[in-house]
Amino acid sequence: MSMKYLMLLFAAMIIRSFANSGNAIETTLSEITNTTTDIPAIRLCGPEGNGYCFHGICIHARDIDGMYCRCSHGYTGIRCQHVVLVDYQRSEKPNTTTSYIPSPGIVLVLLVSIIMCCLLFVYRFTRRTNKLPLQDMVVP
């Protein structure tokens, strides 16, 4: 918004300089902003737009200086008169890429289970070898 006011101030200074033909310029930003009205870029049409849009809201856009329709979901066209048969943007497709990614919790449980199985195997193997008599372990 400040750029808009600076441009208005600059334009007013130039106009005054031509009008005053060399006199001192005493225009301030408050003088310019008090005289200008701020028109919104987009506003509702009002009574003249009743019935203009078939399936949507009538909007008056300052840039195009005319009525414009903002269509409801499922409709398209200048006056929202056409039905959209297939809406690809809003159709829900199964997200296959994320369904194959395991969660960190599952990976952690699987890793702990593998470590526990390895420790159990080592414990049983060392227990068996400790129970054998020394004679069986010595080769003649």
UniProtKB/Swiss-Prot annotation:
Topological domains annotated Extracellular: 19-100
Protein name: Pro-variola growth factor
Family affiliation: Belongs to the orthopoxvirus OPG019 family.
Gene3D superfamilies linked to this entry: Laminin (2.10.25.10)
Keywords: Disulfide bond, Early protein, EGF-like domain, Glycoprotein, Growth factor, Host membrane, Host-virus interaction, Membrane, Secreted, Signal, Transmembrane, Transmembrane helix
Signal peptide: 1-18
Site features described as Cleavage (By host protease), chain residue numbers: T96, T97
Disulfide pattern: C45-C58, C53-C69, C71-C80
InterPro entries per the UniProt record, alphabetical: EGF-like_dom, GF_C11R
Positions in the Cytoplasmic compartment: 122-140
Induction and repression of expression: Expressed in the early phase of the viral replicative cycle.
Function, in words: Stimulates cellular proliferation (hyperplasia)and mobility around infected cells to promote rapid and efficient spread of infection. This effect is beneficial for virus replication in vivo, because poxviruses replicate possibly better in proliferating cells than in quiescent cells. Acts by binding host EGFR, inducing its dimerization, autophosphorylation and leading to activation of several cellular pathways regulating cell proliferation or cell survival.
Glycosylation sites: N34, N95
GO biological process, any: positive regulation of mitotic nuclear division
SUPFAM superfamilies xref list: EGF/Laminin
GO CC annotation, single: membrane
Domain EGF-like: 41-81
Natural source organism: Variola virus
